A protein has these predicted regions:
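Ligand-binding pockets and gating/stacking loops
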Residues: 1-125
Length: 125
């Protein structure tokens, strides 16, 4: 629904590829909520999309599906991805150890990523 953004993202990705920088650059385009189909005036907080490019990931695919029927696009119908899953995938794409823990004040261990996170394996090389 945003032709100018499509053109800008395509130009950025093409430029990074031509310069040999795409595999070393991770581009993520996202918002904090989904939009209703059609004119996009409503907010669907339970189903939103992200776009990933480069970073050595397996890109050019659609992972998951939103609902059809009465309220199309209002909910996740297949392959849900949680915020911890997203973060785990991002960290792995950047070469970080998602099992690492840091010590907070008071010697309280703080995990890099929530232990329930399941990386989006379909995207990882």
């Amino acid at each position: 629904r945003s032709p100018w953004m499509d053109a800008v993202m395509a130009t950025l990705i093409s430029d990074l590829k031509v310069r040999g920088m795409l595999d070393d650059t991770l581009v993520i385009w996202m918002g904090e909520f989904g939009r209703t189909p059609g004119d996009g005036n409503g907010h669907f907080s339970k189903a939103w999309s992200t776009m990933w490019a480069g970073g050595g990931l397996k890109t050019g695919q659609v992972i998951g599906k939103t609902s059809d029927g009465k309220n199309p696009g209002s909910a996740v119908a297949e392959r849900p991805v949680t915020s911890p899953d997203f973060l785990a995938t991002l960290c792995l794409a950047l070469g970080m150890d998602i099992h690492k823990e840091f010590m907070a004040p008071g010697n309280r261990p703080m995990p890099m990523v929530d232990k329930v996170a399941k990386p989006i394996t379909e995207m990882l090389g």
